[in-house]
Amino acid sequence: HKTIQFIVAALFIASACTDDRDNLMVNDQIGLLHSTYTETEIFRGMDTPYQLFVIKSGKGKQETEVSISVDETVLQSYNTDNGTSIQLLPSDCYTILQPALRLNDSDYRKAFDIKWNADRLSDLLSTGKEYGLPIQMSVVQNFISADDERLKTIIVPTIKEPYLQM
């Protein structure tokens, strides 16, 4: 009889406990790892795609889907704000391999893969002008808030010749 009373009392006390683990944690947010401006080197003869990472921060309890698109207004705003004259990279210089990603609740990062056309880029960049790929990320499913400061980037590629160093 006392054992039953003890078990009931223990269950009652345990149910009154609060979980304070999330008290100082912020809600999940999502954004690009490298926002605003990113330079990348493309080596001739190598077919490695560029990885544009999406980072999820916060409690880590929400899943979401995000997508990217090329947005020329991102480039125009950047040029105006920074006094630059980066030109829009023609669409035959790159391929966005997957324009949408799904992040599960346990994922904290995933990457969009962008494949470059190195030969076309080399011809284009030999003119001496600077070209960029302006990317705008959007949250497709609004289960998670977006970090407005980390939704846009301009990827500026440069062509390098591979070399061996000893």
Locate each region found by the language model.
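Sec-dependent signal peptide recognition
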Residues: 1-9
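C-terminal motif of bacterial Sec signal peptides marking the signal peptidase cleavage site
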Residues: 13-16
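Acidic/polar, low-complexity intrinsically disordered N-terminal segments immediately downstream
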Residues: 18-103, 107-111, 120-166
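Localized edge beta-strand/strand-to-loop motifs within extracellular or lumenal beta-rich domains
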Residues: 116-118
